[in-house]
Curated annotation (Swiss-Prot):
It comes from Homo sapiens (Human). It holds the Pfam family eIF-1a. Belongs to the eIF-1A family. Keywords: Cytoplasm, Initiation factor, Isopeptide bond, Protein biosynthesis, RNA-binding, tRNA-binding, Ubl conjugation. There is a cross-link at residue 88 (Glycyl lysine isopeptide (Lys-Gly) (interchain with G-Cter in ubiquitin)). Residues 16-26 have a biased composition (Basic and acidic residues). SMART domains: eIF1a. Component of the 43S pre-initiation complex (43S PIC), which is composed of the 40S ribosomal subunit, EIF1, eIF1A (EIF1AX), eIF3 complex, EIF5 and eIF2-GTP-initiator tRNA complex (eIF2 ternary complex). Interacts with EIF5; this interaction contributes to the maintenance of EIF1 within the open 43S PIC. Interacts through its C-terminal domain (CTD) with the CTD of EIF5B; from the location of the start codon by the 43S complex until the formation of the 80S complex. Residues 124-144 have a biased composition (Acidic residues). Gene3D superfamilies: Nucleic acid-binding proteins. This is Eukaryotic translation initiation factor 1A, Y-chromosomal.
Length: 144
């Protein structure tokens, strides 16, 4: 049987959680960039996004974001426009809900942009769920 000469398994490849909940500086768009909202995830590192200049573009998630940052539909992203292809773009950055709200407050995003409020359902969030008792408790399963 061969010796294990590797340097670790999946966990080593996954890497450390860098700046998980650390606040980062708000990044504004520059020339050649545009804000967009994700319409549809296409798979294979691609997505369809509606840029706020009114153009629907096919976007490619770059390698730095590919496995570290999870992008869902209706997320606000920053895309880099291509000079040679107007209908394609590259995802540069994903804004979280707080950053998207502050971008909207600064007037960078239009008013019709809907910011996705995803709830992670942490501990103690189950207080609002109400279940109704369906059926009678005195009914025995043998009587059916």
């Amino acid at each position: 049987m061969p010796k294990n000469k590797g340097k670790g398994g999946k966990n080593r490849r996954r890497g450390k959680n860098e700046n998980e909940s650390e606040k980062r500086e708000l990044v504004f768009k520059e020339d050649g960039q545009e804000y967009a909202q994700v319409i549809k995830m296409l798979g294979n590192g691609r997505l369809e996004a509606l840029c706020f200049d009114g153009v629907k573009r096919l976007c490619h998630i770059r390698g730095k974001l590919r496995k570290k940052v999870w992008i869902n539909t209706s997320d606000i992203i920053l895309v880099g426009l291509r000079d040679y292809q107007d209908n394609k773009a590259d995802v540069i950055l994903k804004y979280n809900a707080d950053e998207a709200r502050s971008l909207k407050a600064y007037g960078e995003l239009p008013e019709h942009a809907k910011i996705n409020e995803t709830d992670t359902f942490g501990p103690g969030d189950d207080d609002e769920i109400q279940f109704d008792d369906i059926g009678d408790d005195d009914e025995d399963i043998d009587d059916i």
